[in-house]
A protein has these predicted regions:
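Soluble, non-transmembrane catalytic domains of enzymes that act on hydrophobic metabolites at membranes
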Residues: 1-6, 68, 72, 77, ...
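Membrane-anchoring hydrophobic helices of lipid-metabolizing enzymes
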Residues: 2-84, 93-97
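Catalytic core of membrane glycerolipid acyltransferases/transacylases, capturing the structured
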Residues: 32, 36-41, 77-138
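A cross-family acyltransferase "interaction/gating" segment
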Residues: 120-122, 168-240
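Soluble extracytoplasmic domains of inner/organellar membrane proteins
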Residues: 148, 157, 164-166, 170
């Protein structure tokens, strides 16, 4: 049985890649600990910046490259109004993209899981402006909506995954929470699309950050491509009470994005 050149390269490169990623992960935790220290010293801005650096380093250590593509002048339309970004949440690593690259407050359930790997992650995320939520708890979901209003007033922007869960795609479910929030604050709604290359994570590992870290040590390099659309790309209903119309418009947009890939 003959080995292909690509297989031989994989065999030779994998051990080197694994060692490099382990060393990078050690540095990740050093930066994260310094971030906690800054948080304890009330250096909140610096702590937030260090959390963003941690997020970037985590992706680097796992062999994940992030490519941000801004089409035309998509960001210009949000300058005069608050903005609510939507995105198709399909991968547990999205939280690191948002914190490390987009630098936008989000509604996230990451606090339920990342604390297993990053101690006091919830406190770090709250300091960075994120709204923590337990999507299985009705009270928590209601509280998240209230806090989202506060974040939108304070920061002028927030990013929301309308599908709300890694196990439910945006083509299956779209919550109207972003629509309600936008009407309340006269906010502009702009969609992000995340596309993943060589980054499949098994369903049983979606909420297990430790297993994901371990599995990525020897995995082939991957890419997350992030594309921003325009507010006018969403054919949103004129009636602010039309939640179903909002859901249909968002599903249609992401279906078209999926078909164009």
């Amino acid at each position: 049985m003959k080995l292909r050149i690509s297989d031989l390269e994989y065999i030779l490169v994998t051990p080197i890649r694994a060692v490099a990623r382990i060393l990078a992960l050690v540095f990740v935790f050093v930066v994260y600990i310094v971030q906690l220290w800054m948080l304890a010293l009330k250096q909140k801005r610096l702590a937030s910046d260090l959390l963003a650096l941690t997020a970037r380093l985590v992706l680097y250590a796992m062999g994940v490259r992030v490519v941000i593509s801004v089409r035309d002048k998509s960001l210009d339309e949000s300058k005069s109004r608050p903005v609510i970004y939507l995105y198709n949440h399909q991968n547990p690593l999205d939280v690191f993209v948002i914190q490390g690259y987009l630098r936008v407050p989000s509604i996230t359930t990451a606090g339920l899981h990342l604390g297993l790997v990053f101690p006091w992650f919830s406190k770090s995320a709250l300091n960075a402006g994120h709204v923590l939520m337990d999507h299985l708890n009705t009270s928590s979901r209601g509280s998240a909506m209230y806090k989202s209003s506060e974040i939108l007033r304070r920061y002028g922007a927030i990013i929301i995954a309308p599908n709300g869960s890694l196990k439910t795609t945006i083509l299956q479910r779209v919550s109207a929470s972003a629509w309600v929030l936008a009407r309340k604050h006269n906010a502009c709604i702009i969609p992000w699309t995340f596309a993943y290359e060589n980054l499949k994570i098994s369903e049983e590992d979606l909420y297990n950050p430790f297993k994901i870290l371990v599995s990525r040590i020897m995995a082939r390099p991957s890419t997350i491509n992030c594309y921003i659309g325009r507010s006018k790309d969403l054919d949103l209903p004129s009636d602010p009470r039309d939640r179903e119309g909002f859901s249909r418009a968002v599903k249609l947009y992401y279906r078209e994005q999926q078909e164009s890939d």
